[in-house]
Amino acid sequence: MAASQQDNHETRKGDITPEAYRQVLGRFPTGVTLVTGMDGDEPLAVVIGSFVSVSMEPSLVGFLIGADARTWPRIRAGGSFCANVLADDQVDLANAFFTRDGDPWEGTSWVPALSGSPMIPACVASIDCSVFDVMEAGDHSFVVGEVVDLKDHETGGSPLVFLGGSYGSFGPSVGSGS
């Protein structure tokens, strides 16, 4: 990188406001997952928009969670979690767990995954994991899970997508990704 470009980058770094950061990153679509776990007999869940594949060998996935998240420490203490990929017809489910109005589990059908974490068969897919590592990253933690089981629920639904503060779904292909 040329010195003038580097200087420009360093000068501009301090100009990034949380609002600008959120606006620009809001232009990037993300999937919506419901990361679940257990605390004794109590099912727990948190809505995640940062779920990502990390490694195929070993099979690792990850997500970011805010340092102020109240549910995550209870899920982490159990040593496992299940990432349920929400379908485009599950906006109400995402909102129920996001807003925490009433009991979000009421009317939500689930079965125990291999780890015991709640697996939601109405979702597009579920990825059951043991906690592999947790790294602090600014005001978030990056959670890495080792996949112990996974399930394509073959619901025929499309995954729920979040973009610019709104939910949507994945449209027809505009080209091959291969």
Residues covered by each model-derived region:
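Basic, polyanion-binding surface patches
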Residues: A2-S178
